[in-house]
């Protein structure tokens, strides 16, 4: 019954085993992250996050609805985790940014936006999508509440809360640089990846936390170095903090993916590879092995000979990429 509910019954039978599970190392900080109070450090101070109280507004104030949308729904207690409603695809979006194909995203020079603001805008777009992805996971799979357990939904509500702070920091810093979210076009790739896994909770975990969010572990340090090279240490500190806080999001994905595999008698490693093949998703390096190891993703889930070679060449490629980016900016 559970296999049918989780849409795992279509897996090849040779993936169904009793206890042949890949060895996964849980992130040591997972319990502390779960038990911590809601983080209200939504303002970026001189060098680190700072507490920001929510303003008190009357219900008829024009900013009230905006406040509710921007704030943590888990903090406001505005969602029932056992709801049976389905989220309406796609989620609501502001008029800007205009969504275009990835190949049509303009360069910093074409946008007339400096490189640091350009990269920060891209990150803000990722964080906004991450909020929607987390809440979509909570609502879309709420029908499995009894089978999975309430902890699953509490974890992803907390992920959404984290992502809302990250978006707030990015938006604040964009404003300090003289820009705002929506000042350049963006793509809709992340939401399309979400739609691929809309009918299968195991696929959702494989595609989103274990591939898409794991890419943030890989890209974060590279982005920090580029910003430092550009001379924007303030933005680099924001990005470094965001990258650190992505580790528990990936760790949550690992935990629940393995838990669901255990419930259904599936080998996590084989199931992960089968799901990625089914949904035509390919993990792309170079990988940040240290951060991925910390989050608990077994290397055999994503590593192959090509990725090992890419990892060895990564420092050279990253340095060249940094030099090219800075030269392009100087040329403008």
Positions of the model-derived regions?
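Short, Lys/Arg-enriched N-terminal segments with co-localized hydrophobic residues
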Residues: 1-4
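Non-heme di-metal
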Residues: 6-332
């Amino acid at each position: 019954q559970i296999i049918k509910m989780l849409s795992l019954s279509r897996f090849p039978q040779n993936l169904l085993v009793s206890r042949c599970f890949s060895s996964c190392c849980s992130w040591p900080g997972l319990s502390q992250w779960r038990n911590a109070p809601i983080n209200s450090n939504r303002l970026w101070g001189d060098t680190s996050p700072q507490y920001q109280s929510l303003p008190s507004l009357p219900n008829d104030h024009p900013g009230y609805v905006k406040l509710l949308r921007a704030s943590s729904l888990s903090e406001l207690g505005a969602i029932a985790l056992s709801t049976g409603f389905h989220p309406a695809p796609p989620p609501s979006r502001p008029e800007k940014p205009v969504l275009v194909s990835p190949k049509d995203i303009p360069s910093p020079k074409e946008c007339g936006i400096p490189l640091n603001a350009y990269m920060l805008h891209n990150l803000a777009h990722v964080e906004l999508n991450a909020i929607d992805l987390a809440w979509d996971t909570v609502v879309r799979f709420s029908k499995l509440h009894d089978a999975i357990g309430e902890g699953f939904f509490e974890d992803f509500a907390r992920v959404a809360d984290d992502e809302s702070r990250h978006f707030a920091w990015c938006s604040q810093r964009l404003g300090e640089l003289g820009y705002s979210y929506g000042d350049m076009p963006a793509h809709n790739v992340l939401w399309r990846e979400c739609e691929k896994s809309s009918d299968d909770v195991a696929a959702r975990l494989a595609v989103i936390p274990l591939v898409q969010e794991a890419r943030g572990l890989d890209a974060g340090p590279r982005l920090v170095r580029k910003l430092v090279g550009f001379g924007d240490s303030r933005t680099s500190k924001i990005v470094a903090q965001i990258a650190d806080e992505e580790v528990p999001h990936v760790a949550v994905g690992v935990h629940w993916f393995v838990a669901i595999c255990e419930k259904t008698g599936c080998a996590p490693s084989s199931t992960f590879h089968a799901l990625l093949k089914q949904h035509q998703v390919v993990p792309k390096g170079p990988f940040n092995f240290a951060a991925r190891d910390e989050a608990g993703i077994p290397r055999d889930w994503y590593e192959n000979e090509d990725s090992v070679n890419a990892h060895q060449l990564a420092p050279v490629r990253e340095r060249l990429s940094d030099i090219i980016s800075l030269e392009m900016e100087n040329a403008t």
